């Protein structure tokens, strides 16, 4: 299998952590679309949003997603990449989409434990626990629609990687 693997899920779901470990296990390249955009623009996500608004940021995110997609690559997407129907369709057509699903309280706890990883500005202006509840409620159906596989993201990174590898292996056997 050399298909691109796309990691989707909310902020704090572990897309970057699990995605990089998965890439290592598969011998794939790993790319995080947020980091790619930061490197190519020399701006943080917050600066991009401040300068271009969320609409401009999302447009840039769609271009980045298509730019980094290549065989034998694991791509960690931004939490909102699935908001654009074009992105959901693109990912499903060009690879396998893995949704790392975790409850809002787990996501909030992770984001509070690792505040440096929360480089995105708040979406709602509310406390992180409330924001995660609201974001998941709004996006859950879109994550599900995009996903080929829905994985429990509450375990440790290696445990989640093993679950993903098992799911992908079962598919190649069919």
Curated annotation (Swiss-Prot):
Protein name: Shikimate kinase 2
ATP-binding in keyword set: yes
Pathway as given in its UniProt record: Metabolic intermediate biosynthesis; chorismate biosynthesis; chorismate from D-erythrose 4-phosphate and phosphoenolpyruvate: step 5/7
Gene label: aroL
Similarity comment: Belongs to the shikimate kinase family. AroL subfamily.
Function: Catalyzes the specific phosphorylation of the 3-hydroxyl group of shikimic acid using ATP as a cosubstrate.
Location in or out of the cell: Cytoplasm
Cofactor(s) of this protein: Mg(2+)
Catalytic activity: shikimate + ATP = 3-phosphoshikimate + ADP + H(+)
EC number(s) on file: 2.7.1.71
Binding residue positions for substrate: 34, 58, 79, 139
The protein's assembly and partners: Monomer.
Top-level lineage group: Bacteria
SUPFAM superfamilies, alphabetized: P-loop containing nucleoside triphosphate hydrolases
Binding-site positions, Mg(2+): 16, 32
Residues annotated to bind ATP: 12-17, 120
PROSITE patterns reported in the protein's UniProt record: SHIKIMATE_KINASE
Chain segments carrying region LID domain: 112-126
Record GO biological process: amino acid biosynthetic process; aromatic amino acid family biosynthetic process; chorismate biosynthetic process
A GO CC term attached to the entry: cytosol
Main location: cytoplasm
Domain comment in the entry: The LID domain closes over the active site upon ATP binding.
PANTHER family found in the cross-reference section: SHIKIMATE KINASE (PTHR21087), SHIKIMATE KINASE 2 (PTHR21087:SF21)
Cofactor descriptive note: Binds 1 Mg(2+) ion per subunit.
Keywords annotated in UniProt: Amino-acid biosynthesis, Aromatic amino acid biosynthesis, ATP-binding, Cytoplasm, Kinase, Magnesium, Metal-binding, Nucleotide-binding, Transferase
GO molecular function, one term: shikimate kinase activity
């Amino acid at each position: 299998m050399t298909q691109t693997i796309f990691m989707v899920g909310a902020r704090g779901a572990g897309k970057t952590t699990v995605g990089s470990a998965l890439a290592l296990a598969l011998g794939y390249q790993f790319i995080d679309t947020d980091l790619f955009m930061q490197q190519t623009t020399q701006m943080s996500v917050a600066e991009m949003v401040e300068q271009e608004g969320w609409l401009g940021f999302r447009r840039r995110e769609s271009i980045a997603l298509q730019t980094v997609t290549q065989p034998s690559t694991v791509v960690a997407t931004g939490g909102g990449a699935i908001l654009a129907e074009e992105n959901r369709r693109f990912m499903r057509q060009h690879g396998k989409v893995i949704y790392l699903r975790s409850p809002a309280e787990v996501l909030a706890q992770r984001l509070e434990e690792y505040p440096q990883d929360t480089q995105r500005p708040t979406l709602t202006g509310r406390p992180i626990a409330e924001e995660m509840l609201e974001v998941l409620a709004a996006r859950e159906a879109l994550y599900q629609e995009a996903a080929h596989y829905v994985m429990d993201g509450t375990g440790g990174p290696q445990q989640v990687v093993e679950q993903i590898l098992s799911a992908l292996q079962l598919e190649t056997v069919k």
